[in-house]
């Protein structure tokens, strides 16, 4: 069978490589959905870049909003009729906390933060618009990372920060994790 999956597709590079190798070995088609390539404005941007209508691209900047913080809460009973073990999947079992389920992106074992959640959409757009689908960045760097205070919060992933990358063709990419939901996302 072929596979369609939502992000995050893996939580480690090793998991990602295992996925690719397994699909190749089985002859399985794998697709991770990011739902942005069918958006008219992104299609227009790609056409403009690939046809050279905006000149030489040297940097692509994008932004995801800051992650929430989840205050410590006590475990509670699992809601009736809900299979918490299935929701957890292969991650280490933890007592049920509704806020943890609602804010799954704020924990390493279920979401890995906003860069892995929403940043996936914008990284895909950079790859697609630049025509680098079958390659990827050759250098990575993170900076300005702000972590939640573990005394106040149970959330684990970065609240804000900056992800920079460089492609083999010399184009730079930057994804900022800052601002709110309605801020500009790609320029």
Model-derived features: where do they sit?
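Short, solvent-exposed loop/turn segments at the edges of secondary structure
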Residues: 23-25, 39, 82, 156-160
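Structural recognition of the beta-strand scaffold that forms the well-ordered cores
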Residues: 4-5, 11, 29-32, 58-62, ...
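Rossmann-like dinucleotide-binding domain that binds NAD(P)(H)
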Residues: 85-171
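Basic phosphate/pyrophosphate-binding loop/patch that engages nucleotide-derived ligands
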Residues: 21-28, 43-58, 75-81
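Core domains of carbohydrate- and sulfate-ester-processing enzymes
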Residues: 61-100
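Beta-strand-loop-alpha-helix segment that lines the small-molecule cofactor/substrate pocket
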Residues: 1-38, 52
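Flexible, glycine/threonine-enriched loop-and-boundary segments that flank and lead into catalytic domains
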Residues: 170-185
């Amino acid at each position: 069978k072929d596979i369609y999956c939502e992000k995050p597709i893996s939580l480690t590079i090793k998991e990602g490589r295992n996925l690719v190798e397994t699909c190749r070995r089985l002859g399985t088609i794998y697709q991770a959905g990011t739902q942005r390539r069918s958006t008219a404005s992104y299609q227009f941007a790609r056409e403009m870049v690939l046809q050279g209508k905006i000149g030489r691209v040297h940097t692509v900047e994008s932004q995801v909003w800051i992650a929430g913080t989840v205050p410590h809460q006590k475990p509670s009973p699992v809601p009736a009729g809900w299979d918490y073990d299935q929701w957890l999947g292969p991650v280490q079992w933890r007592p049920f906390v509704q806020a943890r389920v609602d804010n799954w992106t704020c924990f390493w074992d279920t979401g890995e933060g906003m860069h892995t959640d929403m940043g996936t959409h914008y990284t895909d757009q950079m790859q697609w618009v630049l025509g680098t689908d079958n390659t990827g960045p050759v250098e990575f760097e993170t900076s300005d990372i702000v972590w939640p205070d573990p005394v106040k919060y149970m959330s684990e992933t970065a609240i804000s920060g900056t992800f920079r990358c460089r492609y083999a063709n010399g184009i730079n990419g930057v994804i900022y994790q800052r601002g709110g939901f309605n801020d500009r996302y790609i320029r």
